[in-house]
Every structure is written in C-alpha cells, then in structure tokens.
Amino acid sequence: MINKFKNFVSNYQQSNHYKEPLGFGIARVDIAPISKKILCATYPVLNWKDENLGSYAVFCNSLSKEKILKESASERVIEIDESFVLKALDFYTPFLNEAYSNKMAHKNIQVVLELLKALEENRLKNSDGESLYRLVILYEDKPCESVESAYMKLLALSLGKAPLRSLNLEGIFNQLSNAAWSGNKPYELEWLRMNEVALKMRDHFPSIDFIDKFPRYLMQLIPEFDNIRLLDSSKTRFGAYLGTGGYTQMPGASYVNFNAGAMGVCMNEGRISSSVVVGAGTDIGGGASVLGVLSGGNNNPISIGKNCLLGANSVTGISLGDGCIVDAGVAILAGSVIEIEENEFKKLLEVNSALEKHANNLYKGKELSGKNGVHFRSNSQNGKLIAFRSVKKIELNQNLH
C-alpha cells in the first residue's frame, strides 16, 4: 500500500496541473462576529518548501473546488469540509496505524485526525455556518493577500524555516486587524463595545491582556530548544526568531519585534527592533536599543555581529561586525561623527581591510557600519564620540544559557 501511495504522489507531481508550493498547512481561524474578518490563523503544522510533499498531494486531491475561498497566482485558501477530511484519511490509510499509536509521527495526519474529531463533534463550522478550518497554500513570496498567508509567513520566520528578512511582508499591517487578546483568544473591538453592558452585567467581560494586530510569540509556537528562556511573554512578537538555543530574554526593557531576532546564544535585556538580526554570543544590556526599519526613516536593516556587547541604554543605528562594543549610554547613528586616533585606525585596519583613512581622523557612523572589532565610547572629558580597536573578549555566562 505504501508503494501505491508513492506512485500516487509521483503521478500527481508529474501531472500538468501540479503547482509546487512555497508553503502549505491547515489553519484554524478566528472570525470577527460583526465584520467577518479573520482575526487570527493558527497552524499546528507548517510545511515549508519541499517538506512533506506527499501530504501536499493528499490535500490537493482532497479539496473541493467549490470550497475555494480565495485564489490568486501567489496563494490559495480553501474551506475544509467533511469530504476533504474523509478523502484525506482514505489517502493516508497506509500510515494510520502508526499515526494512532505515535502522536509524534506523521504530523499532517495528526492534523487530519483532529479534523475528524471536529467533524464528529460538529465543530468544523461556527454557529453562523462559517468554516473554521482552512487549507492554505502559498505558491510565491508576494505581498500578503490574506490573514492566513500573513500568519503562515510569520510562523515560517519564527520557526526558522525562512531566514529573517527573506520574506515579502508588504501589506501585512493592512491585512491584520487590531484585536483585543485575552489568553489565546482575539476579540473584535467593535463586538466588545456593542456587548460591553451585557458582558459586564453577567460577569463575562474578558480579561484583556493587550490590544494589537499581532499575537505574542508564545501564543503561536513552542520554542524548539529547551534552553530558550522568555521571562515575560509580552516581550516577543509573533514573527520573531530566537535562534538555535541558548537565547535568554529578561523582563523589563527587553523586546523583540517581528522579522527580527537572534541567531543563537544571546542575553537580551534590550530592544531588538523590526528587521534587526543579532549574532550568536551577543549581550544586549538593559534598555539598549537597536533601531529598526518600521519608522523614523531608516531603510537599512541593521545586523549585529557575533560576540558583541551593547551597553545599558545604548542606541545602535548602524550595523556592527563581530566583536564590537558600544559602551553604556552611547548612541551610534549613521550620521554620528566619531574620532579614531591614527594608531587605533591601524589596529582596526588589520581586521577591516576596506576601511578608508581620513586625514582629520573623523568618521561618520555609516562608514563604520558592519566593521569588526570596534569599541565605541564617549570621551568623559570632552564628550566626543571615539572608537578604537576592541580587545575585550565578550563571553556570556554559560550557566545562564
């Protein structure tokens, strides 16, 4: 039977109507009662690029064309109905025994088995007859055309399936609706206003945690590595990436926006703005800010290299190479004027061959962007910004990571 399944997949992939996916998965959606907009789309399993193309063949051959809710060259959203569930299970017959006995096996089958339970318990649709489960297929990385595709891209970033800054997130703010979040549930703001009196009189008014277009990171996924620590769930937005283990985020002034994050072991007590990528081994001190691209006119995404130290309350508006230090309270922006003495310039030139010498020893911050081994400091006697070759080795406390 397994060979029959393989032949089915192979034949489908060679057919004229086969279209290779960038990503696909089944999502459960939350629908606003008044506007009917999608407030949230939750994917228990995300298949990215060439992952699980057998399940892609199953899903595409189980859907009903009349159930297509949205279709374009770049994405497709299809309603899950009874026919889809039963057809998919029939295709999956060779693997069902293993899936029933091991919940960690065949994750896409596990999703369909949960859909079967929803079918049996009459939960495929809400009380208004609207489908709560959708098959979502992303074909091309184009601007987001639906909430479902926006959530798929954010999840791909958070899981590390797509590198930070690699996906087209244009239009994402227009697709997502501002909602009141209580626990993992989004509430339509207009619905809350309309029903405020009744909800409060019956003591059913939800405890609202926050209002935003984005859910929090921990509301959508479990970190893949056990040594990732988030001490305050409100400080990390969905769409952030926290690396391959050892990331620690302290409470207080720390924050990570979507499409930003750390690549590995990192101590973060500061703010990692949108599109910022932080290298492994870097320590971001309390209240330190790394500027992003969402506002303020900065269109150049910032990267922080490996084994850097951003001191408390520092501001970094340029990219840093490996082994850099920005002292506490120091602001380094693209237009900042920084003095480098001639002997220190020679030391920096040893690790930055492209560095160009200025006769007056003054350099703009943007000229030092991405350079390795630079230590930025404010001269306490005259207030000048200075830079010199960093000789301090940045080592994180291994017991904390």
UniProtKB/Swiss-Prot annotation:
GO terms for cellular component: cytoplasm. Its main location: cytoplasm. The active site is at E269 (acyl-anhydride intermediate). GO terms for molecular function: 2,3,4,5-tetrahydropyridine-2,6-dicarboxylate N-succinyltransferase activity. Pathway: Amino-acid biosynthesis; L-lysine biosynthesis via DAP pathway; LL-2,6-diaminopimelate from (S)-tetrahydrodipicolinate (succinylase route): step 1/3. It catalyses: (S)-2,3,4,5-tetrahydrodipicolinate + succinyl-CoA + H2O = (S)-2-succinylamino-6-oxoheptanedioate + CoA. Keywords: Acyltransferase, Amino-acid biosynthesis, Cytoplasm, Diaminopimelate biosynthesis, Lysine biosynthesis, Transferase. Belongs to the type 2 tetrahydrodipicolinate N-succinyltransferase family. This is 2,3,4,5-tetrahydropyridine-2,6-dicarboxylate N-succinyltransferase. It comes from Helicobacter pylori (strain ATCC 700392 / 26695) (Campylobacter pylori).
